[in-house]
């Protein structure tokens, strides 16, 4: 199994949970904020999905495409589905050698990193915010929540 397939499985083990949590956010709760300084549920979900896609585009040395014209008019489930599929395609496009390529992220985070580290940074970011998302959906009243990660 190539590095791309291994990473894709790791990505999906977390992203499938993220998408399940996003699916629990009803239209009436998209503007929910646990505190006045918190991101809204919609903003948090979009931030997670788009950031991972952008980091993966950089790691795959491909131009980031604007996937939606009107984010606020797109359902969270559609955002999750499209960003997940596009991120999967980028991961699948990478060869084992691509994982070692140096990616210049000086404008974004001030350094250059191997592509594999860029992907791991994206995963750390997703895991961090997935914890936030668990809190949001709990506070929306949901008690039937998925495990932190799902294999298979």
Task: Pin down the residues of each PLM region.
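Extreme N-terminal tail/first-helix region
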Residues: 1-12, 78
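Acidic catalytic patch
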Residues: 94-109
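Secondary-structure boundary/capping positions in well-ordered alpha/beta enzyme cores
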Residues: 28-29, 97
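Short, contiguous alpha-helical
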Residues: 8, 12, 16-19, 29-69, ...
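A ubiquitous short alpha-helical element
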Residues: 2, 75, 117-118
